[in-house]
Design a protein with these regions (language model features):
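N-terminal export signals
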Residues: 5-27
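C-terminal segment of N-terminal export signals and the immediately downstream linker at the start
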Residues: 22-40
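Alpha-helical cap/lid subdomain in secreted, periplasmic
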Residues: 33-39, 52-217, 231-245
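A short beta-strand-loop structural module common to alpha/beta enzyme folds
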Residues: 39-49
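Conserved donor-binding loops in enzymes that form glycosidic bonds
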Residues: 45, 189, 193, 222
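Short, solvent-exposed loop/turn elements at domain surfaces
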Residues: 49-52, 226-228
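Active-site metal-binding loops of divalent metal-dependent hydrolases
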Residues: 75, 222-223
Length: 245
């Protein structure tokens, strides 16, 4: 399957399944102490940057002995509140990747999602993002993610580009990111329920197309991974679990 066909299929299936209401996550609870083989673990924590992931990687990721770790991180690293300079971000990402792959887990690194700048700039000072602006900083972060994936021979999925193409990033009610029309919030960063369905579907197709492990998957990241914190509600790990079950 060519990349364009893969992208087109993801968009078509997401639209069809989302409209039909066919994507529902089943009940699930994680228990690393039991030693049970879990299908998908939601290890996303709101507000995390790469420094935070390094502090909790042993307990929240490696303790599950993952067959596959999916890591999406960098949105908080590029913002002023939890800023991590690009060189440090690269170093952190290398260390995280080395620990994960050194444990025997396969690694899938994903780009960070786009955002609606007018909303973002109500929470973060515009001067902080100069000279390249918020979108320019995101491009730079995603370039680092791609380069580290290549350096470590990890899988790489530019899921952010899919959101840019079909996500209607802005103020429309059917945007895949939260806004005033669809959630009564000036968010512009976090996915809507349909956005999480789309993300789960796109990731599941990437995993299956590239024959990555489909058991003991740890989704490791920040609030975009976390969603509602579950694997049976509104999060991409929840929809991923359903699709791979």
């Amino acid at each position: 399957m060519h990349r364009k066909d893969f992208i087109r299929r993801s968009a078509i299936l997401t639209s069809a399944l989302g409209s039909a209401g066919l994507l529902q996550a089943s009940a699930f609870s994680t228990n690393k102490r039991s030693g049970a083989l879990e299908l998908v673990v939601n290890a996303g924590v709101s507000g995390n940057n790469t420094n935070n992931l390094l502090k909790r990687i042993d307990t929240d990721c490696l303790a599950y002995k993952p067959g596959l770790t999916i890591m999406m991180i960098g949105t908080n690293d590029m913002n002023n509140g939890k800023f991590v300079p690009p060189d440090k971000f690269r170093t952190n990402l290398r260390e995280l990747s080395g620990k994960i792959m050194g444990s025997g887990s396969k690694l899938l690194l994903m780009t960070i999602l786009p955002f609606y700048e007018p909303y973002l700039l109500t929470r973060h000072p515009a001067d902080f993002f100069q000279p390249e602006g918020p979108s320019g900083k995101r491009v730079a972060m995603n370039t680092i993610i791609k380069e580290v994936a290549a350096e470590k021979s990890a899988s790489f999925f530019d899921v952010g580009s899919l959101f840019e193409k079909v996500g209607k990033i802005g103020t429309d009610k059917d945007s895949l990111l939260r806004n005033e029309e669809n959630s009564k919030k000036t968010d512009g960063v976090h996915p809507t329920p349909n956005g999480y369905r789309f993300l789960g579907l796109a990731v599941s197709q990437f995993i299956q197309f590239n024959q990555l492990p489909v058991e003991r998957i740890v989704c490791f990241g920040d609030s975009i991974t976390c969603g509602d914190g579950s694997v049976d509600g509104e999060s991409y790990p929840a929809y991923l679990k359903k699709l791979l079950s």
